[in-house]
Structures are given as structure tokens and as C-alpha cells.
């Protein structure tokens, strides 16, 4: 069924399928949060395991990454909502492929529709991306992404401009924008291993250091 989510295979079915996936991720995320509560009434044997969560995200990841580039705005919004929920469930499975597509699209601005879709998706996922507690490798990408998005402010393309401004606004409301290169480390917490993607890990100290280095030119944004 993945072919039905491909942007070039557009039809009314895309909206229905994207909405179906959106409802699936909503119900799944709601159940995950409910089972984390101390007063959860679901028996332990019936609760969602980490393996089930991982398989759920892997199953729906590809179709959402395809439909986020749909030419139909409702389909795109539904896919972004699904990706956002899954990014909080398993950020190491969702954010790396989104970032890979984002950098490749923003570095080649010839495809306007694809660029707009990427920027709006980044705006939707910005909270997960800039939160070290969610995805430790995310903050180091913030400054490069902001600079790559600047050409998105285009008076001849209102939708792309709106998406770019929403990304900048969302980031500005989520983090304090400043030069953090002189900030200290977290001591013993820096040795904690954190996932980068599906196969690789790093230390929190290394990711925090990379994030601090990436903010060397952030004073321009906070002035």
C-alpha cells in the first residue's frame, strides 16, 4: 500500500489514508501515555511493550515520510501530525530521516513545493527536535536549519514564507536563542549513551558539545 502514499500517485484515497494513519498514531500515543500513569487499570500483561512501540513506528514511518510531500495540504498536515506523535514515541527512528530529507531539500531550493513541505514539517516537529531530553542529537541541527530556511522568506511565495516564519516562531518559543559555546558541560551526565538513529549511539556530552559549537553564530538571531 505504500504506493498509494507516494506524492506522484495523488487521489482522494491519499486524504483518507493519511487521516487513517493520523487516527492510528493518535490512539496509539494516547494509550502509551495512559499506560505510563500510576493509576492505569490495564493489566501489565496487556500493556504496550517497547518492542510493540518500535514496530508500530517502523510500520508507519515510511508512508508518513512519503505523504508529507503530498500536493494535497490536508494529507500533508495529517502526515505531519502523525510524524510529530511518533517523534515523541521513538525520536531516533523519526527525526534522522526527516533531517536527511530536510537538508537535501533546503540545500536545493529549486523544488518549491518540496521545500515548503519540509519547512512546515520541521515547524511541526520543532519541539521534539530542540529538546535534548527527547532527542539529544537534535539541538546541534537547529542553527544550520535556521540559516538554510532563510531563503524561504520569499515575497513571491506567501505559503513558503508563512511556513518559514512559523518554524522560526516555534523555535523561538521553545528555546533561548544565544551563543552557548562558552557554556560548561554536565559532568557525569555527559557519559550517558543516547541513540542517534536506528543503529548508532553517542554520548550526551558529545552531543551537548556539538550543540554548543553550532550556536557560535546565534547572537545574530538574538540581537
Label each PLM-derived region with a short phrase.
Residues 1-101, 110-141, 198-223:
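Alpha-solenoid helical repeat scaffolds
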Residues 5, 43, 143-146, 154-161, ...:
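Very long, low-complexity or repeat-rich scaffold/adaptor subunits
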Amino acid at each position: 500500500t505504500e504506493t498509494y502514499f507516494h506524492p506522484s500517485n495523488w487521489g482522494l484515497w491519499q486524504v483518507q489514508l493519511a487521516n487513517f494513519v493520523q487516527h492510528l498514531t493518535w490512539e496509539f500515543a494516547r494509550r502509551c501515555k495512559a499506560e505510563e500513569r500510576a493509576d492505569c487499570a490495564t493489566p501489565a500483561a496487556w500493556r504496550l511493550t517497547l518492542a510493540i512501540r518500535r514496530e508500530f513506528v517502523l510500520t508507519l514511518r515510511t508512508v508518513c515520510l512519503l505523504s508529507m510531500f503530498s500536493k494535497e495540504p490536508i494529507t500533508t498536515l495529517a502526515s505531519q501530525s502523525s510524524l510529530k506523535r511518533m517523534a515523541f514515541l521513538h525520536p531516533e527512528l523519526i527525526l534522522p530521516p526527516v533531517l536527511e530529507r530536510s537538508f537535501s531539500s533546503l540545500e536545493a531550493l529549486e523544488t518549491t513545493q518540496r521545500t515548503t513541505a519540509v519547512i512546515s514539517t520541521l515547524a511541526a516537529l520543532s519541539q521534539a527536535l530542540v529538546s535534548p531530553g527527547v532527542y539529544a542529537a537534535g539541538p546541534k541541527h537547529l542553527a544550520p536549519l535556521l540559516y538554510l530556511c532563510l531563503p524561504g522568506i520569499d515575497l513571491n511565495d506567501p505559503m513558503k514564507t508563512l511556513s518559514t516564519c512559523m518554524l522560526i516562531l516555534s523555535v523561538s518559543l521553545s528555546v533561548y536563542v544565544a551563543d552557548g559555546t562558552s557554556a560548561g558541560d554536565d559532568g557525569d551526565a555527559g557519559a550517558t549513551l543516547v541513540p542517534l538513529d536506528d543503529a548508532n549511539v553517542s554520548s550526551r556530552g558529545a552531543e551537548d558539545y556539538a550543540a554548543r559549537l553550532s550556536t557560535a553564530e546565534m547572537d545574530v538571531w538574538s540581537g
